[in-house]
A protein has these predicted regions:
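FAD-binding subdomain of flavoenzyme oxidoreductases
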Residues: 95-99, 107-186
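Residue-level detector of anion-binding/catalytic polar loops
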Residues: 64-65, 127
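N-terminal flexible segment immediately upstream of the FAD-binding catalytic core
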Residues: 1-60, 73-104, 155
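Short, ordered loop/turn segments at secondary-structure junctions
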Residues: 70-73, 133
């Protein structure tokens, strides 16, 4: 498959945000144990939902496979580009967007590291229970694998703490599911 690099550069503009061919670091092509291998044609670092949407729209229209990636701990092999295409690295989308203490919710981007989220809420006297073995994993990765860890028996797993998501579908459509609304008990 031949990617239109000029189209990708219009979507993912800026220094050190789009890599192709031999410029893609080798750690992006296999799992952490070196058992699963793949090969992508491009590696993109979006900074916004709009860029993710535009990139997925391009990939959908041109039938290019996309492999999303968070922190890349890759302990389950899910971020290896087995079908080639584009690696969509969300690690630079790593901000807290909102903390709502009334609803006890925090809205973060998918690349936020678990250890950073835990430190953020703990500094405010709050607690985020899911605690998988890899502290440098991303929240997006935790959601995609429903990570739990040693606290799961007492507190549950990641899905138990997700109230809503902003998702970008494979065709680039942006969708809001759930939310942080509190519903009174009657």
């Amino acid at each position: 498959m031949a990617l239109d690099l000029s189209a990708l550069r219009r979507i993912i503009a800026g220094e050190n945000r789009l890599f192709t061919g031999a410029d893609i670091p080798v750690e992006y092509q296999s799992d952490v144990l070196g058992r699963v291998h793949g090969s992508a044609e491009a590696l993109a670092f979006p900074l916004s939902t709009e860029e993710v949407s535009a990139l997925l729209r391009y990939a959908h229209e041109h039938r290019v496979p996309v492999t999303p990636r968070g922190a890349g701990t890759n302990l389950v092999g899910s971020t290896v580009p087995l079908e080639g295409g584009i690696i969509l690295d969300l690690s630079r989308m790593d901000r807290v967007l909102e903390l709502d203490e009334d609803t006890m919710t925090v809205t973060v981007e998918p690349g936020m590291l678990l250890q950073d989220l835990q430190a953020y809420v703990e500094a405010r006297g709050l607690f985020y229970p899911p605690d998988p073995g890899e502290k440098a994993s991303s929240i997006g990765g935790n959601i995609s694998t429903n990570a739990g860890g040693m606290r799961a028996v007492k507190y549950g797993v990641t899905r138990d703490y997700v109230r809503g998501l902003e998702v970008v579908l494979a065709d680039g459509t942006v969708m809001q599911v759930g939310g942080n609304e509190l519903h009174p008990i009657c």
